[in-house]
Amino acid sequence: MQTREQKLKLLNKTIETLWHGVSDTKEGDYPKIINLYKEVLKLNPKDKDAWENMIWLMWSMAINKKDTAWLFEAEKFAKMYLSINPNGYRAFEYVGQFYRIMMVDERLAIRYYESALRWKDAPETTFHSLTSLYLKRGDKIRAIGNCRFNLKRFPNDPYAKSKLKELTK
């Protein structure tokens, strides 16, 4: 009988071989890898990389197969990822990125990026993404406010400095 750690090691090695260990990923490999990630997450639901890679693969399948069912499946797992990993900025930022890039719902993306910024471990890039979203939606006031908030946490952030200067001309 394999231990939990041995099973995880074998699953991750299989994923690595299927996804990165061959020169060309074959038709049908992504669904196999997705299922392997689901097995990994049954054993280790806190594995943030597994969640993010699996969701990315589902999004990729939606594009490659032109099948929105994969995208809706990815959305379901993105929400599940956040519910299991609600502490820290990373899951909130990832779900924000999911809605910004994959589902293209800027309103929801903004909500999740704003939630990510409540955490002290949020990096400058999270602020940058949110500023960009505010500007894309035409909300200059919130973009300026976000730049100022960013500079309180990261006083030497060149992006925030230049963007704030540009916006307050």
Stretches with model-predicted labels:
Residues 49-129:
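Alpha-helical adaptor scaffolds
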Residues 3, 26-44, 70-85:
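Amphipathic alpha-helices of TPR/Sel1-like and other helical repeat/solenoid scaffolds
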Residues 1-31:
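N-terminal leader/linker segments that initiate helical-solenoid repeat arrays
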Residues 15-27, 55, 59-66, 96-104, ...:
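Short coil/turn linking the two alpha-helices of tandem helical-hairpin repeats
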Residues 41, 78-82, 117, 151, ...:
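A conserved position within tetratricopeptide repeats
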Residues 133-169:
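Terminal, low-structured helical/coil segments at or just beyond the last alpha-helical repeat
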Residues 7-11, 30, 48, 71, ...:
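Start-of-helix signal in alpha-solenoid helical-repeat scaffolds, especially tetratricopeptide repeats
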